[in-house]
């Protein structure tokens, strides 16, 4: 099951973080923050090939004993990070990739809202919040 979904701005500050259970919220914030180093390493290793790709699914960033952390980067360098419970062995790479695509599409809808200021935290979008909730339930 997905326990944390985060949207990180180009400048590496969180635009949106949602986690369950909430008593481990600080732990998930730390995991998301530490995964940004791995994301930067993968992006710099790709070099010029990064410019040619339409989407950048980074795959598994790093596993821990209880969780697996996956990453995705858009062309505008916005990063999506998903922390998944390691006990869920039924999740495949294709399913994680499609979840990131849904998250990216929903993020694009938020960006197209004329009342949203780019770079602000995503707080007032019920549609985005509902989509994240459905993704977290879907993975269970």
UniProtKB/Swiss-Prot annotation:
Domain of life (superkingdom): Eukaryota
Disulfide-bond pairs as recorded: none
Compartment(s): Cytoplasm, Perinuclear region; Endoplasmic reticulum; Golgi apparatus
Keywords from the named record: Cytoplasm, Disease variant, Endoplasmic reticulum, Epilepsy, ER-Golgi transport, Golgi apparatus, Transport
Any Gene Ontology biological process: vesicle coating
InterPro entries: Longin-like_dom_sf, Sedlin, TRAPPC2L
Cellular component per GO, a single term: nucleus
Tissue: Expressed in testis, liver, bladder, lung, spleen and brain, several cell lines and primary chondrocytes cell line.
Annotated disease: Encephalopathy, progressive, early-onset, with episodic rhabdomyolysis: An autosomal recessive disease characterized by progressive encephalopathy exacerbated by febrile illness and associated with severe neurodevelopmental delay, episodes of rhabdomyolysis, developmental regression, epilepsy and tetraplegia.
PANTHER family in the record: TRAFFICKING PROTEIN PARTICLE COMPLEX SUBUNIT 2
Its job: Plays a role in vesicular transport from endoplasmic reticulum to Golgi.
Protein family according to the UniProt entry: Belongs to the TRAPP small subunits family. Sedlin subfamily.
Complex and partners: Component of the multisubunit TRAPP (transport protein particle) complex, which includes at least TRAPPC2, TRAPPC2L, TRAPPC3, TRAPPC3L, TRAPPC4, TRAPPC5, TRAPPC8, TRAPPC9, TRAPPC10, TRAPPC11 and TRAPPC12. Interacts with the heterodimer TRAPPC3-TRAPPC6A. Interacts with TRAPPC6A.
Name this polypeptide is given: Trafficking protein particle complex subunit 2-like protein
Organism, scientific name: Homo sapiens (Human)
Lineage, opening ranks: Eukaryota, Metazoa, Chordata, Craniata, Vertebrata
